[in-house]
């Protein structure tokens, strides 16, 4: 409201001094700024090779990842005219996240249904109010079994990589679209009434003119200049917790550990059931939080405008560090093998089993039939939320905006004529309101009056029209990242669930993806040399190829041997061929939901960052409600009219005067004729101060005053109380899928798993037709010496053939069983003659194995023979008896930490989880610096007239004035 100090200076109303700034208003609720989206998760690494370990029990659920960083707040949108309630618009950018609330209890996993066809997009409905969070229902039964996926060999998880240094701040992103205007803030308390100004110097007394008629009540004086803007309000209390962020990006993969030497190759066993997923690693430390940008100047609280278009997706937050490896679960029971189900999606690799002790080199058995696919295990329940990280450091206030242009100056009123000083009469009755007269000229400033007592604050005026929106400020620089907060405490592990019934076997599925090749076994030691056989009798002509033999009966299965001691680690061999796909494991039961973790302690307050550039100019504030007219003050006696004096110095504002008692109304005097205008006389003596006259009628509003320059910024006031908790917002729409990241580097090969027990040997298939000789292979390792056969009869020497090109040495053959001793034939004595090559003798029975001879020199390569025809496939033998399950091997030592891999492509954003209960209010932030005041708006309606101050003491009489003209 505008304060007035009306003085008896020829009936002219003089504006009084401006009052002091009002107190700081209460903080408004948090505005709906954008909420940042979590970065995309990285692509899973390549699964390592190794046999499948035994299935362990479901481990305790891991902790959830951290929320993403908040996006930049949007600029305030322009205020639109109030219209009817329309349909719900597109979602706007989310606001800055508040303190993270406690996570609600997770529901049990329901049955996974088949994806239906996408329906047409319906029009968005109007938002309904959020209901109160329901109580947690009873635990449901386990969901239906999902389609089994092909399980790859489990690779060992590498250790966490070293924490990377914080990167340089990224470039400043483009300014988001205008956000929605915040809710109307709480009504500020009225400031104290300004002190009464000191009186100006006494004007020169004019000669009394003829008595003029009683003029009508003059119009109200011009409104005073706008008061200085009040100090900036304290920061509002943190808003209620935002919705949980999307899952964070997957951490970088560790460096590939060195491959250990492979052990000797054991017998091929049946694929074991896939192991359970290990415990989730400990929660990584959250990434550094950026310094909050400078807040813009407070905008005017206007009516809610139309909903704006959604803003661009926020930048993805930095990926969190990869958690440490979880502890290995206990082995579970064997699942019942069902028929092979359809090929499912590729499952995540299970943990690698420990490396077993090398056993003795066994004979290579025939490949057994692939086992049936097992049932897929049910996913584990999500773990409790981690503790809330410490709040980031408070950002500095933005730079003040430029002052607004001054308003137009109002018209000056016409100066009225001074009337003669009449005798002090009895106070008359209050007259009726007269016709408004012409505006009078501005009189000289009087002396500063004494400070009156403070009056009661007037009620707030009605809201004025909204001003034009100021120009947008330049975006601030991105702040440096703050220090990383302490890691949250790990949640308590959940209790183990009750095992459920086995599901029905699934339908037969397609063949799974090809597994990674296993490690090549170490060559076994050579066998002992047998005794040299005696010379056999000369054989006859070679016989024709015999008919294929009948298939032998399968032998009885031998008893399982005890596990041997752990052997030394062998040298690394080449990569072996791909193994058969393993069976899917039986679906595990969903474990109970663990309790939510305790809330973390708030972190230390961060230091203020450098001052950012000026924020956007705030919108014009709403003018206050028009105050009600105050009670009329006591009427004073009119003093002698004074001449125009020099304006006095601006006095210090005094306290408002106390309200005086109203005098009795006096009778209205007759209206006299107007007198002639007299010359301005010499200043007369100052008359005694008259008593208060009757209250004047309320004048019409005066012309608008000139807008004064903006005042200096006030000191920051104390922080206000936290605002009320806002109504819980509706569930936000699903965010857009983030950009695909770069493919990460393959993970390190895990340690080899424990070898399984050898399975029974299957029935031998029928012998295939002998194919044509194939291409001669390269020279292999020298084989064990075969048994020496009986020597053939010496034939005549043939003519020597041409020497062919040297051929590659073929692979060594396995040692055959010792043959029976051949019959000794008669030897031909005498000097050997050179004869022709005789016919090839018949092959004699194999003799006993002779001693191993030294390896011969590599012969010349022979010509390449034609490629042999593919032999017929033998009949499939009966499935062998399932072997005993091997004992679990010891846990191998952890490998060295791996180097971080590249960022993988982001997966599709998951649906937003259920909103948790609101968290407790955080500690208030540090008061920011005051911004420059915004442009001054047009003057509001005239406020109520202040109460009259107490009557001052009479002044000294002035000097007599000169006589007037006749």
From Swiss-Prot:
Residues 1-966 are annotated as: Disordered. Belongs to the fibrillar collagen family. It is found in: Secreted; Secreted, Extracellular space; Secreted, Extracellular space, Extracellular matrix. Residues 168-180, 664-676, 805-815, 951-966 have a biased composition (Pro residues). Glycans are attached at residues 100, 882. Coiled coil: none annotated. The modification Allysine is found at residue 7. Residues 64-78, 867-881 have a biased composition (Basic and acidic residues). The keyword Nucleus does not apply. It comes from the Eukaryota. One of its GO terms (cellular component) is extracellular space. Keywords: Extracellular matrix, Glycoprotein, Hydroxylation, Phosphoprotein, Secreted. This is Collagen alpha-1(I) chain. The modification 3-hydroxyproline is found at residues 709, 938, 953, 956, 959. The modification 5-hydroxylysine is found at residues 100, 265, 340, 575, 686, 870, 882. Trimers of one alpha 2(I) and two alpha 1(I) chains. Residues 114-130, 148-166, 214-253, 373-399, 408-427, 469-496, 608-622, 635-662, 691-707, 736-755, 852-866, 900-933 have a biased composition (Low complexity). The modification 4-hydroxyproline is found at residues 27, 30, 32, 41, 44, 47, 61, 76, 82, 91, 97, 124, 127, 133, 142, 148, 169, 178, 181, 208, 211, 223, 229, 238, 244, 247, 262, 271, 274, 286, 295, 310, 316, 325, 331, 349, 358, 364, 370, 379, 382, 391, 400, 406, 418, 427, 436, 439, 457, 475, 481, 487, 493, 499, 505, 517, 526, 538, 542, 548, 554, 563, 581, 596, 602, 623, 629, 632, 641, 647, 665, 674, 683, 695, 701, 710, 719, 722, 746, 755, 773, 782, 785, 791, 806, 812, 818, 826, 832, 897, 900, 918, 933, 939, 954, 957, 960, 963, 966.
């Amino acid at each position: 409201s505008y304060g007035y100090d009306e003085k008896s200076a020829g009936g002219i109303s003089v504006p009084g001094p401006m009052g002091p700034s009002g107190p700081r208003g209460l903080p408004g609720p948090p505005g709906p700024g954008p909420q940042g989206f979590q970065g995309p998760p990285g692509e899973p690494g390549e699964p390592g090779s190794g046999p499948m370990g035994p299935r362990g029990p479901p481990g305790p659920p891991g902790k959830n990842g951290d929320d993403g960083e908040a996006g930049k707040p949007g600029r305030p949108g322009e205020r639109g005219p109030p219209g009817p309630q329309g349909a719900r618009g597109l979602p706007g950018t989310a606001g800055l996240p508040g303190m993270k609330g406690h996570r609600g209890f997770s529901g049990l996993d329901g049955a996974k249904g088949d994806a239906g066809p996408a329906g047409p997009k319906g029009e968005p409905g109007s938002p309904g109010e959020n209901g109160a969070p329901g109580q947690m229902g009873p635990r449901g039964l386990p969901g239906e079994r999902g389609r089994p996926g092909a399980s790859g060999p489990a690779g060992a998880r590498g250790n966490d990589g070293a924490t990377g240094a914080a990167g340089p701040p990224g470039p400043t992103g483009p300014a988001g679209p205008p956000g929605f205007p915040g809710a109307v803030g709480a009504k500020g308390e009225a400031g104290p009434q300004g002190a009464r100004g000191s009186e100006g110097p006494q004007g020169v007394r004019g000669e009394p003119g003829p008595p003029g008629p009683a003029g009508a009540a003059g119009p109200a004086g011009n409104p005073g200049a706008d008061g200085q803007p009040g100090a900036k309000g304290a920061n509002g209390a943190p808003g209620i917790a935002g919705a949980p962020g999307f899952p964070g990006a997957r951490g970088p993969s560790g460096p590939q550990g060195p491959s250990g030497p492979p052990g000797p190759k054991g017998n091929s066993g049946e694929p074991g059931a896939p192991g359970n997923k290990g415990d989730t690693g400990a929660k990584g430390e959250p990434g550094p939080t950026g310094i909050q940008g400078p807040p813009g100047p407070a905008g005017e609280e206007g009516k809610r405008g139309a909903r704006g278009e959604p803003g661009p997706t926020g930048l993805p937050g930095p990926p969190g560090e990869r958690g440490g490896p979880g502890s290995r679960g206990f082995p579970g029971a064997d699942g019942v093998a069902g028929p092979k189900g359809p090929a499912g999606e590729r499952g995540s690799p299970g943990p690698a089993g420990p490396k077993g002790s090398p056993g003795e080199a066994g004979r290579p058995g025939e490949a057994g039939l692939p086992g049936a696919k097992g049932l897929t295990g049910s996913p584990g329940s999500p773990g409790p939320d981690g503790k809330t990280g410490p709040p980031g450091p408070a950002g500095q206030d933005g730079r003040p905006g430029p002052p607004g242009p001054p308003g137009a100056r109002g018209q000056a009123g016409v100066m009225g004529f001074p009337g003669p000083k009449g005798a002090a009469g009895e106070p008359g009755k209050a007259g009726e309101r007269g016709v408004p007269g012409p505006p009078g000229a501005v009189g000289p400033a009087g002396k500063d009056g004494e400070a009156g007592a403070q009056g009661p604050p007037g009620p707030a005026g009605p809201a004025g029209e909204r001003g034009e929106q100021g120009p947008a400020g330049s975006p601030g620089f991105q702040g440096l990242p703050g220090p990383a907060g302490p890691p949250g405490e790990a949640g308590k592990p959940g209790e183990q669930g009750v095992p459920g019934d086995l599901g029905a076997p699934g339908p037969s599925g397609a063949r799974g993806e090809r597994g990674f090749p296993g490690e090549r076994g170490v060559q076994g030691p050579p066998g002992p040399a047998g005794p040299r056989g005696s010379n056999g009798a000369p054989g006859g002509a070679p016989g024709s190829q015999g008919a294929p033999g009948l298939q032998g009966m399968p032998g009885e299965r031998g008893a399982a041997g005890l596990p041997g001691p752990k052997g030394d680690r062998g040298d690394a061999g080449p990569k072996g061929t791909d193994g058969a796909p393993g069976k899917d494991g039986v679906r595990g039961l969903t474990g109970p939901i663990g309790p939510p973790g305790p809330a973390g302690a708030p972190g230390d307050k961060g230091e203020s960052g450098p001052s950012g550039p000026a924020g956007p100019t705030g919108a014009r504030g709403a003018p206050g409600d028009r105050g009600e007219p105050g009670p009329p003050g006591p009427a004073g006696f009119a003093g002698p009219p004074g001449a125009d004096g020099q304006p006095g110095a601006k006095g210090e504002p005094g306290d408002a005067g106390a309200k005086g008692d109203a005098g009795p109304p006096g009778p209205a005097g007759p209206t006299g004729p107007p007198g002639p205008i007299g010359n301005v006389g010499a200043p007369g003596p100052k008359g005694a101060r008259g008593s208060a006259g009757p209250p004047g009628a309320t004048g019409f509003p005066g012309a608008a005053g000139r807008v004064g320059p903006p005042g200096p910024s006030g000191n920051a006031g104390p922080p206000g109380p936290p605002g009320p908790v806002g109504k819980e917002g509706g569930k936000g729409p699903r965010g857009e899928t983030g950009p695909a990241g770069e493919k990460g580097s393959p993970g390190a090969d895990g340690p080899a798993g424990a070898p399984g027990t050898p399975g029974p040997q299957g029935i031998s298939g029928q012998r295939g037709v002998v194919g044509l000789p194939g291409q001669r292979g390269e020279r292999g390792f020298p084989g064990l010496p075969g048994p020496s056969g009986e020597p053939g009869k010496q034939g005549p020497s043939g003519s020597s053939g041409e020497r062919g090109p040297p051929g590659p040495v073929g692979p060594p053959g396995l040692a055959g069983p010792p043959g029976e001793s051949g019959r000794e034939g008669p030897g031909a004595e005498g000097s050997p003659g050179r004869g022709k090559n005789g016919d090839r003798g018949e092959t004699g029975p194999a003799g006993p194995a002779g001693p191993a001879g030294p390896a011969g020199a590599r012969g010349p390569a022979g010509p390449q023979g034609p490629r042999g025809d593919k032999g017929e496939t033998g009949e499939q033998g009966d499935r062998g008896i399932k072997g005993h399950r091997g004992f679990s091997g010891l846990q191998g030592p952890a490998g060295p930490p791996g180097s971080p891999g590249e960022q993988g492509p982001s997966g599709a954003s998951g649906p937003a989880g259920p909103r948790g209960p609101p968290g407790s209010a955080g500690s208030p932030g540090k008061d920011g610096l005051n911004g420059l005041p915004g442009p001054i708006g047009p003057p509001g309606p005239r406020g109520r007239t202040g109460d009259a101050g107490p009557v001052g003491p009479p002044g000294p009489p002035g000097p007599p004035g000169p006589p007037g003209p006749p």
